[in-house]
Design a protein with these regions (language model features):
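Short Pro-Gly-centered beta-turn/loop motif in secreted/extracellular proteins
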Residues: 72-80
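Short, solvent-exposed S/T- and G/P-enriched segments that are highly enriched in secreted/extracellular
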Residues: 65-72
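Amphipathic, positively biased hydrophobic alpha-helical segments used for protein targeting
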Residues: 9, 79-80, 109
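Primarily secretory-pathway and cell-envelope proteins
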Residues: 20-56, 61-63, 84-138
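Sec-dependent N-terminal signal peptides
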Residues: 4-18
Length: 138
């Protein structure tokens, strides 16, 4: 069973655009459980810090990614998450809260997804947040 979900979300005031795609993979054997994984790519000239937050509360993971870099976050359990993102370049710092997403990680399958972040000067969508809100880990 494979599902492909594409999401395009504009993030940050000069607008960091995060696009996501998710594939759910079926596991034929119940002998082991594969971890879910989300690959994060920074397609901008900004250094970004992405906080993966549990919707039920609390910080799950933080990744700081340099310009044009990438990283991954592994998940051992299913859950609902969202991102808080900070983009920095010189004296400019932008903060946004991203849309929610679901991660599936069970004996019968797991999520493998991708988030790509872009910084664009064409408007913004998503929720702007303050530095204080970004710094909170709950």
């Amino acid at each position: 069973m494979k599902k492909l979900i594409s999401i395009l979300t504009a993030v940050l005031t000069l607008s960091i655009v995060a696009s996501a795609s998710v594939t759910e993979n079926s596991v034929e054997y119940d002998l082991y459980q594969q971890n879910a994984v989300i690959h994060i790519s920074n397609r901008s000239d900004y250094t970004i810090t992405v906080k993966v937050m549990r919707i039920s509360g609390g910080l799950y993971a933080t990744r700081t990614i340099g310009p044009r870099g990438s990283s991954s976050v592994s998940f051992e359990k299913s859950g609902d998450f969202y991102t808080k993102t900070k983009a920095e370049k010189g004296l400019e710092t932008l903060y946004k809260k991203g849309s929610s997403f679901n991660v599936y990680c069970e004996a019968d399958g797991y999520t493998e997804g991708a988030l790509e972040f872009y910084v664009s000067g064409y408007g913004s969508s998503g929720q702007s947040i303050s530095r204080a809100e970004f710094e909170k880990n709950y």
